[in-house]
Amino acid sequence: MTYIEILGQNAKKASQSVARLSTASKNEILRDLARNIVADTETILTENARDVAKAKDNGISEIMVDRLRLNKDRIQAIANGIYQVADLADPIGQVVSGYTNLDGLKILKKRVPLGVIAMIFESRPNVSVDAFSLAFKTGNAIILRGGKDAIFSNTALVNCMRQTLQDTGHNPDIVQLVEDTSHVVAEELMQATDYVDVLIPRGGAKLIQTVKEKSKIPVIETGVGNVHIYIDEFADLDMAAKIVINAKTQRPSVCNAAEGLVVHQAIAKGFLSQLEKMLKESNQSVEFRADEEALQLLENAVAASESDYATEFLDYIMSVKVVDSFEQAISWINKYSSHHSEAIITNNISRAEIFQDMVDAAAVYVNASTRFTDGFVFGLGAEIGISTQKLHARGPMGLEALTSTKYYINGTGQVRE
């Protein structure tokens, strides 16, 4: 058997036992894990330091290194996320619908685990813990394949998960880490249809596209955030500038950070001037990649290429497009959007409603930063990712997104005539 086949076989077996765990047992194990991760802080930080040092040696940008870096506060935040998942209602066994039909059959539709989840993700080691917590709470086994940049951190965290399961008398193969980070093994995982029920990629555009093209397993697409903010002619310009600065600069390396700015021509001159002024006042610097009209209105800008409008920069860079109309803004955003999060800043209620209806994205904001697209903020607890597709799940994916449904039919000897 190949390496992936062994992991898959182990996961399939483990999925049968975890599916039968009671809510109380799952919650107790999750709380044990949270305590154990905090207790293992020094070990985890030591291993994370190896990843960070390697990343710096490889010339990875400081913004991307920050995604990788752990500290005591971030480890405590990881533990807090596990506690929050433990406190959430368990969807497994929930009756979605139920009725007795004309034949006297009692038909229930219940929530059940998906089975075995595989996840391929990049950089941030906290993702491994979030993914396990949600998968475990919903009675699933999970195979984690992180990037080579975080292999030492992920190994330390998964070892803690497996030890917690073993110490509580449960199969440690409920969670497994693919320790071989080669592309060959990753592609083998994408073909493991005999063992894996769903594959969730979480990372950059290249990773997502590779998984979509090569996976034979059903895929839930997540992550890529070419996010826009449209400043309407009826916007409060001061509020608009504050929102843009927050959405672009608070944490530019995450998928809900804004990447594109679309501005109505009627207020472009005043707004762009005010935006640059407020950026200077807040000691922030953003490189604007602008169209011809915006280029004449901005001090710190370069001419945009066509590819810039479709790029998730994950940096202090932002494309800028000036539009002649509200309708053109919607058309522009729908052309370049990755269907993650989009926003309009306006005091025109009618336009706000039309924008939310017509823009094709999982989350559409009016007068708020796109940085709020997050499982915790939406009340889901930790998220396994933000789905940008329409089937099965869309937007931040919490517990319910990791379940399926099953019909339970009970009779008293009925036969079909």
Curated annotation (Swiss-Prot):
Pathway: Amino-acid biosynthesis; L-proline biosynthesis; L-glutamate 5-semialdehyde from L-glutamate: step 2/2. Keywords: Amino-acid biosynthesis, Cytoplasm, NADP, Oxidoreductase, Proline biosynthesis. InterPro entries: Ald_DH/histidinol_DH, Ald_DH_C, Ald_DH_N, Aldehyde_DH_dom, G-glutamylP_reductase_CS, Glu-5-SA_DH, GPR_dom. It catalyses: L-glutamate 5-semialdehyde + phosphate + NADP(+) = L-glutamyl 5-phosphate + NADPH + H(+). GO terms for biological process: L-proline biosynthetic process. It is an enzyme of class 1 (oxidoreductase). Pfam families: Aldedh (PF00171). The keyword Signal does not apply. Its EC number is 1.2.1.41. Transmembrane segments: none annotated. It is found in: Cytoplasm. GO terms for molecular function: glutamate-5-semialdehyde dehydrogenase activity; NADP binding. CDD domains: ALDH_F18-19_ProA-GPR. GO terms for cellular component: cytoplasm. Catalyzes the NADPH-dependent reduction of L-glutamate 5-phosphate into L-glutamate 5-semialdehyde and phosphate. The product spontaneously undergoes cyclization to form 1-pyrroline-5-carboxylate. HAMAP family: ProA. Belongs to the gamma-glutamyl phosphate reductase family. This is Gamma-glutamyl phosphate reductase. It comes from Streptococcus agalactiae serotype III (strain NEM316). The lineage of its organism: Bacteria, Bacillati, Bacillota, Bacilli, Lactobacillales. The gene is proA.
